[in-house]
Amino acid sequence: MFNIPITKPDLGEEEKQLISQVIESGWVSQGPKVAEFEEIFARYVGARHAVATTSCTTALHAALSVSGIGPGDEVIVPSLSFIATANSVLYCGATPVFVDVDPETCNIDVQKIEETVTRKTRAIMPVHQMGLPADLDPIKKIAEKNKLLIIEDAACAIGSAYENTKIGGHGNIACFSFHPRKIITTGEGGMITADDPTIAERLRRFRHHGMSVSDIERHMANSVIIETYPELGYNYRMTDMQAAMGIGQMKKLSFLLDARKQMARMYDNELGKIPHIRIPQVPSYARHNYQSYWIELLASAPVDRNTLMAKLLEKGIATRRGIMAIHRELCYQAYAGIYLPNTDRLTDNTLLLPLYPALSAEEQTFIINSIKEIFKQ
């Protein structure tokens, strides 16, 4: 009997040694390792600045806040996303405005963005869903035409690229996640990339209670520094222990991406032959990191999505629903009446399959054969 989880972080001796070094140094809160991790990350994606946080959720909140988003403002977001996308807008007192997605990519429908812009719109928040880049060029044109900000929810998108430029390197603010289900992990954690030095500096203060000076600056100063608090902030600081793990993870990122791509290709080749299943489509402008692998059950499928998930679990195979429709959750009941047909169909009929480097060929073959077997019953 197999016991196959939906994902498994790839952690080993290197991460263990790096974390041990931090413990031995005595500096376990935010310090030099966070700064090192930020530098490595910024260089990798091609951004001028990277600012580490406690999660992608806090990264999104910080990015919106320092961008001046607040009460009376609207931010255009896809409903087909993890709930943190819209929650971060509400945290600022602003209003999320939900739009539908492209049914082929599960990413925000560019045409719907154009139709949704009002005089209250301040920003567009495209989500690179499951690691597949959104179509950024037309979104940028809409933003420039209407003088809007773009803040990318890149939670899943490390290593993905749009038009051969990595996500995070397109000049917009972009927010990444290091949750254990992502390509690399720091346990919990996030990162914001930006090119504007003023925005980057404000983000660093925002994550540190709005304080005028960092712990490193005080530690390295030759004289006493009395800090000030020029603006409201939060404690969104990543620790050096987490950053050490992240540094170790960045060293193996290329391997992790290659392994996922190979496994996704195997799923494509086998599941793409089943007439009841639609597999992910990757546009020519995108390089997909396959943070997750999703399939959609078509109307012709002999079982529904939930039944398939239950039968796979009986065989020891964990799955997850594809993506939530935020507007259908109880805390967003004020949006319950909006019509987003692609979002509704995808949230009801998609599921995520196990995908991680430690997944063996035998286990992946078992997953594929189990789906085929269930469809024949």
Where are these regions (language model features)?
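Structural detector of well-ordered beta-strand residues that form the stable sheet scaffold
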Residues: 51, 76, 97, 150-151, ...
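Phosphate-binding glycine-rich loop
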Residues: 27-74, 88-92, 98-100, 165
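PLP-dependent aminotransferase-like
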Residues: 65-154, 161
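Glycine-/small-residue-rich active-site loops that bind phosphorylated ligands and cofactors
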Residues: 11, 29, 81, 104-105, ...
